[in-house]
């Protein structure tokens, strides 16, 4: 197993599936011509064993072996719960 396990911070955008969440990961990319930094978003499916996440939560996820066709990330911890 590698020493560097990929972890990402993201925001939960869907929790409707059983034991699964969809996490939006934002990154800043420099435009090749104009030089302005633009936000880019990637959505990934992650495994949430206890169904503890809600929409809007900030979470930390890590890469793991493929758990299904689209799921290859798992929840590490909830960094901040969403304000209701």
UniProtKB/Swiss-Prot annotation:
| A molecular function (GO) term | structural constituent of ribosome
Pfam families, alphabetized: Ribosomal_S17
Q: Where is the signal peptide?
A: none
Keyword Cell division listed? The answer is: no
Which top-rank group of organisms is this from?
Bacteria
Which Gene3D superfamilies does this chain map to? Answer: Nucleic acid-binding proteins (2.40.50.140)
GO BP terms in the entry: translation
Alphabetically sorted, this entry's keywords are: Ribonucleoprotein, Ribosomal protein, RNA-binding, rRNA-binding
Q: State the SUPFAM superfamilies in the record.
A: Nucleic acid-binding proteins
Extract the InterPro entries matched here: NA-bd_OB-fold, Ribosomal_uS17, Ribosomal_uS17_bact/chlr, Ribosomal_uS17_CS
Q: Which GO terms describe its cellular component?
A: cytosolic small ribosomal subunit
Say what the protein does: One of the primary rRNA binding proteins, it binds specifically to the 5'-end of 16S ribosomal RNA.
Which family is annotated? Belongs to the universal ribosomal protein uS17 family.
Assembly mode: Part of the 30S ribosomal subunit.
The identity of this protein, by name, is Small ribosomal subunit protein uS17
């Amino acid at each position: 197993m590698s020493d560097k396990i990929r972890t990402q911070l993201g925001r939960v955008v869907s929790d409707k599936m059983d034991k699964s969440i969809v996490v939006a990961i934002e990154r800043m990319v420099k435009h090749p011509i104009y030089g302005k930094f633009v936000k880019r978003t990637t959505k990934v499916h992650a495994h949430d064993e206890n169904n503890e996440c809600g929409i809007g939560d900030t979470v930390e996820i890590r890469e793991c072996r493929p758990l299904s066709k689209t799921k290859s990330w798992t929840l590490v911890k909830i960094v901040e719960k969403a304000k209701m």
